[in-house]
């Protein structure tokens, strides 16, 4: 199994992992200029919140790790951009009013231990109507295999939320999925299973 959470990113594009296509290719985030964006969990050595600020967004980020926040704050200083950082659990979004965020992004933070229902409800609350919630997780099928060995080593859903569980949680939180990418590593186009699942869901209702 691969752990994409700590993959290195270079800050030049919104990243879903160092071995898969970024948003310059997928275009699920799109143009973030002048948008108020929220990164849920700091991903990479240069977090996506810094990258989005470099691209003209008004960036906000939250992460439970003080060390991650300090490191990301320094990355923002080094990049000469302003990012509003908060230390706390991803669903602890009480510092945000209702319907104030134009885009929410969560890359490789959702696990079996995540209270997905609460997180998705809180993201729905802070997003503007029809705004996008984009998240990336290790593809559930990638956890079944070890590398490119086609022998199943674990049961589907034993170590990661299944696609069905994620889809149902989004539906119950009043989101509608409009984009889903099952990404294989760019250097392994014939891999046994996709390594990364990227989903964009739109907020329904107010």
Which residues does each predicted region cover?
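Class I SAM-dependent methyltransferase SAM/SAH-binding core
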Residues: 36-92
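A short glycine-rich, Lys/Arg-flanked "PGG" loop and its adjoining helix->strand segment in the class I
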Residues: 117-132
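A short acidic, Gly/Pro-enriched loop at the edge of an enzyme's catalytic core
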Residues: 91-104
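A short SAM/SAH-binding and catalytic strip from SAM-dependent methyltransferases
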Residues: 102-117
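Conserved alpha-helix/loop element of class I SAM-dependent methyltransferases that forms part
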Residues: 5-36, 47
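Conserved class I S-adenosyl-L-methionine
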Residues: 132-158
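Short alpha-helix
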Residues: 158-180
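Core SAM-dependent methyltransferase catalytic element
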Residues: 173-176, 189-206
């Amino acid at each position: 199994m691969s752990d994409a959470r700590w993959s290195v990113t270079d800050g030049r594009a919104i990243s879903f992992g160092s071995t898969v296509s970024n948003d310059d290719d997928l275009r699920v985030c799109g143009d973030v200029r002048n948008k108020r964006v929220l990164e849920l969990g700091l991903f990479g050595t240069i977090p996506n919140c810094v990258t989005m600020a470099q691209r003209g967004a008004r960036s906000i980020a939250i992460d439970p790790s003080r060390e991650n926040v300090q490191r990301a704050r320094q990355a923002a200083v080094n990049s000469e951009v302003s990012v509003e950082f908060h230390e706390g659990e991803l669903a602890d979004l009480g510092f945000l009013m209702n319907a104030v965020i134009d885009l929410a992004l969560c890359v490789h933070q959702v696990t079996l231990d995540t209270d997905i229902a609460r997180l998705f409800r809180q993201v729905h609350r802070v997003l503007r109507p029809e705004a996008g919630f984009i998240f990336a997780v290790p593809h559930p099928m990638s956890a079944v295999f070890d590398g490119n060995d086609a022998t199943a080593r674990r049961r589907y859903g034993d170590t990661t939320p299944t696609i069905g569980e994620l889809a149902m949680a989004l539906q119950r939180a009043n989101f509608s999925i409009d984009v889903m990418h099952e990404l294989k590593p760019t250097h392994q186009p014939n891999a046994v299973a996709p390594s990364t699942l990227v989903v964009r869901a739109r907020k329904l209702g107010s």
